[in-house]
Amino acid sequence: MRSLVLAVLAVVPSTLVLSMPAAADCAAITKALTGIVTDLTCLESTDLTTRNDATTPPDNSRPGLPPNAFTPRTDAQAVSPDAPFRTAIDPSRTFPGLQITGAMADDANARWLLRLPAAANWNHKLVVGVPGGFRSEFMGDFIFSDLVVQQGFAYVSTNKGMLNFFFTAAGADPLACRLSPRVAATGAAFTHFYANDAGNSIREWFRRTLEATDVAELAIDAHYDRAPERVYLMGISNGGHVVRRLLAEAPTRFDGGLDWEGVFWSTGGPNILIDLPVALRNWDGYVTSGLSATSPASLAIRAAGYPPDIRATPPTPANTFSPLVGSLWETHANNYWDVTTCVFVRLVDPLYPVDQLDPLAASDTKDYDYLARRKPFHLSPRVGQVATDGDIARRLITVQGTMDTLLPIVHHGRAFRDAVVTAGRASLHRYYEVQNGNHIERYRQTCCNFVQLELIQPHAHRAFQLLLDWVERGVSPPASQCIPRGGAIVSDPAAAARPERCASLLVE
């Protein structure tokens, strides 16, 4: 009966099927994971890439959760370029295998996803994808999974132990965080991020990533009857931070990693709780100035490390929290600056009395002063537990764009590179700056039309291939370099007169 059903499924368009349980294989995997995971689903897929619509579940498809808590398709699209610049999928092949999902036994919201290629296609290696923000385990479906599944890797990802967010009422929810600055059209909207719930922490991200790796290795052994020969990490933003930490504190588990625009944390700075409040304190003044580049507010934001503001061509009225997308700073302020500050203040400094309802309370996100609170409120030990000191013990390639307007490159990518050099680990690290690259790929395209921006994904994917050659063939990757607009990583940056760091954050 199983073979008959599969024969029928073979002629059904892949957009319709994630298929059916593969009884024998799934039974072995279920047995191997007994007592470790819960809510396990194991299905045979005709194609593990996103060409199969069933690969990434619909948004809000987990019963019992509020809207926005679980949004796999939104998560995958948020960090990926739009077509036609998405990861290319070979039209001449399909990529069958098992798709397995579940949660850790101690927390039903600590979710993971595992994709196991058909045995004939598996290359005996595993990639661990770590999402950015607080997004789901499906966030890397376009940017990570589609790349590595086609190469025969098994792929596992985790939501780092927590769901995303839901909209809430500020007065009734003590953990509410305003979505956008007060002057924005969405300044009255409030969110509740699961990261701020009791028991959740940044440290949990590291533990849950290691647990997802454990799950994958157990399932791989049960399915293929052998352990993976190599295990690699790939992470973006908060996920890049996790990659950096794990290559320092758990290096025996991994062979190397790709860090795409990871967050830098240091007890004495820089860190996002120093940068973001400065931008927020000056935001109203910048708006009042008519978004003038020469206003004192603009100069103060630039002095905090942020790249220059740019304008969309043409402005777009949709697909954003901004009523009109005309300014890159405005788009980041309304989507990220305010809410990110609030969430991380609650994570790192829970004694800070966040008050976003009373303009006179002087305890809003823009009022936060990390350096003034660091010693009195003992923040150094808390930040030290998640800091990225550069003491990596496995090969790592970092890629970041110079126009990153959420994590300014001068305080994140460059600061981490400096930390690696100071730690004496430069031989294990390569650092590639993408001229005009931004934190959000889609902002270059029809979402927002910031045509001055460059995509980072092609360089991140190239960096992963360089990492594989470095680890498996001993081929040293090209030296750290600035990748110019329209360019690529070159083997001899000195001969090409390329510095390690781009001379300007913006090249028009």
Task: Tell where the protein language model's regions lie, with residue ranges.
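C-terminal His-loop and adjacent cap/lid subdomain of alpha/beta-hydrolase
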Residues: 24-508
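Positively charged n-region of N-terminal signal peptides that target proteins for export
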Residues: 1-4
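Sec/Tat signal peptide C-region and signal peptidase I cleavage site
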Residues: 18-24
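Bacterial N-terminal signal peptides
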Residues: 6-17
